[in-house]
Design a protein with these regions (language model features):
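Short cytosolic juxtamembrane segments of multi-pass membrane proteins
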Residues: 452-465
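N-terminal Sec/SRP start-transfer signal
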Residues: 1-33, 47-48
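Basic-flanked hydrophobic alpha-helices used for secretion and membrane insertion
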Residues: 160, 164, 168-305
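Hydrophobic, regular-secondary-structure patches
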Residues: 36-122, 129-155
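Short helix-loop junctions at transmembrane helix boundaries
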Residues: 42, 323, 388-434, 447, ...
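Transmembrane alpha-helical interface segments in multi-pass membrane proteins
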Residues: 348-350, 355-402
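Peri-transmembrane interface segments
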Residues: 38, 42, 248, 282-341, ...
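Internal alpha-helical transmembrane segments of multipass membrane proteins
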Residues: 23, 325-346, 384, 393, ...
Length: 465
């Protein structure tokens, strides 16, 4: 009779104890798989959001991430159009690319001089159509709806501001913002003096600017240091206020067309960008695309440019990913300990109850190694069946209940609720790894009791009552 068959029959001898141990392991495996599926789905959602905002890759002047915000004109890509054309036309890159578009980051002072108010801003200039395509990216097939954008190609002077910035500029009524916090009525003297200086520049911008805004439009004047160091000012029509997920960002956010941002930084008729943003069709080919982009960029500009990934441009992505993976690792460790003690206790009790039987088996010539193997297999069988049951329960609960229940939560930095999903069916390696790990842990926890059983002396075991 085979050792495996003996182990299986011994598992069935005490069905109640085996069932309790199996249920414990199943719950532990289900917890690991469901948490792992939730972490996988959350990371995919975070990657989708990050890639929509900043793309997969960015080509920029070397050192821009460290020093570019202080002087965007100095670190700008002045002649980005030929490079963008090369990247789009490259036979290896063309099938991988979804969007290639320039962006320009700029900081300065925003003013609404009708209300004698001003505040600092941080703006990003985008090509309207390219931005809409970026915000619709769903390369991970999550079914996430496209994010809205207020930028329009036929409205070159229109942009959006954060709700916090709108409050600082006293635009609550003008932009019809609900739950808007009103600014204090009194204006400090120093601020009034600064506003007077900015008002003079605003008048110059109105006189030198293009067509006047439509009647009733909400006009915000944006002031920033130009390429020559002298201040430039442009007039932007704020079409709406968009609430940002982070308060500090909400109080400085401005989104505007690329041409308007270029006019603010470089003056009329000049062009430049902070970076070329590349969004891929598939995130899985990021390393391949980065290597090829780096080669094309080096051939074009030598070592003056560098290629950065979205994780480097947005460091918070890796921080959140590490946090979730650490949480998953901690819970997995706890479930492993539960499995370890549950199986060890079951096998220990089996050894104690069957001491006489062990003596009989040894007396008829069964070697110590086979005794040890039999008890290890008992623990392994309970662990394997419990893990398989737990994975099956996780698949049923996640796919049939939780993913269709409409549960949602609002992550930090978001303003809209995100559906709670558990990606179990797309995590085959997680399911297989859980079964193998639980089985291995069960075998390891059975080894010491099995060793004790195998080391029993035949005479002592037979005399055991």
């Amino acid at each position: 009779m085979s050792t495996l068959f003996l182990a299986w029959r011994n598992v069935l001898r005490n069905r109640r104890r085996s069932a309790i141990t199996l249920a414990t392991i199943a719950v532990a495996a289900m917890a690991v798989v469901m948490l792992g599926g939730y972490v996988a789905a959350t990371i995919k959602g975070l990657e989708t959001l990050t890639v929509r905002q900043v793309g997969h890759l960015q080509v920029m002047s070397r050192g821009y991430l460290e020093f570019g915000r202080a002087n965007p004109a100095r670190h700008a890509l002045r002649d980005y159009a030929p490079l963008a054309g090369r990247l789009r036309a490259d036979p290896q890159l063309a099938p991988l690319l979804h969007v290639v578009t320039p962006t320009l980051q700029v900081q300065g002072v925003a003013g609404h001089f009708a209300s004698a108010s001003s505040s600092t801003f941080s703006a990003a200039g985008w090509v309207a159509d390219d931005r809409a395509r970026m915000l619709a990216w769903d390369g991970l097939r999550l079914g996430t709806p496209p994010l809205p954008t207020a930028l329009r190609a036929d409205r070159p002077d229109d942009g959006v501001i954060g709700v916090g910035l709108a409050q600082l500029l006293d635009l609550c009524d003008a932009l019809a913002i609900a739950d808007c916090v009103r600014a204090p009525a009194a204006v400090p003297a120093a601020a009034a003096a600064i506003d007077a200086d900015l008002a003079a520049l605003s008048r110059q911008a109105r006189e030198a600017g293009p067509a006047a805004p439509a009647a009733g439009a909400v006009v915000v004047d944006l002031l920033a240091a130009g390429a020559s160091g002298a201040p430039n000012i442009v007039r932007m029509t704020a079409t709406r206020a968009e609430r940002q997920g982070v308060r500090e960002l909400d109080m400085v956010h401005v989104g505007l067309p690329l041409a308007l941002a270029q006019r603010l930084v470089f003056g009329t008729g000049a062009a430049g960008a902070s970076a070329l943003v590349l969004q891929l069709e598939d995130s899985a080919r990021l390393d391949e695309a980065r290597a090829r982009v780096a080669a094309v960029v080096h051939d074009y500009a030598g070592d003056t440019l560098e290629v950065r990934t979205f994780a480097e441009v947005s460091p918070s992505y890796n921080q959140v990913v590490r946090m979730f993976r650490t949480l998953f690792g901690f819970v997995s460790l706890l479930m492993a300990v539960v499995t370890l003690f549950a199986v060890a206790n079951t096998v220990n009790m089996a050894v104690s109850e069957r001491t006489g039987e062990i003596g009989s088996l040894r007396a008829i010539g069964l070697p110590r190694a086979r005794i040890r193997r039999m008890f290890v297999l008992e623990g392994g069988l309970v662990g394997a069946f419990g893990a398989v049951l737990g994975v099956a329960l996780a698949v049923v609960l996640a796919g049939g209940l939780i993913n269709h229940a409409g549960f949602s939560w609002t992550p930090p930095g978001n303003i809209t609720p995100v559906p709670i999903t558990i990606d179990v069916q797309g995590s085959a390696r997680l399911c297989l790894g859980t079964v193998l790990a639980m089985t291995l842990i069960a075998c390891i926890s059975s080894w010491w009791p099995a060793r004790r059983a195998a080391r029993l002396e035949i005479v002592e075991a037979l005399r055991h009552a």
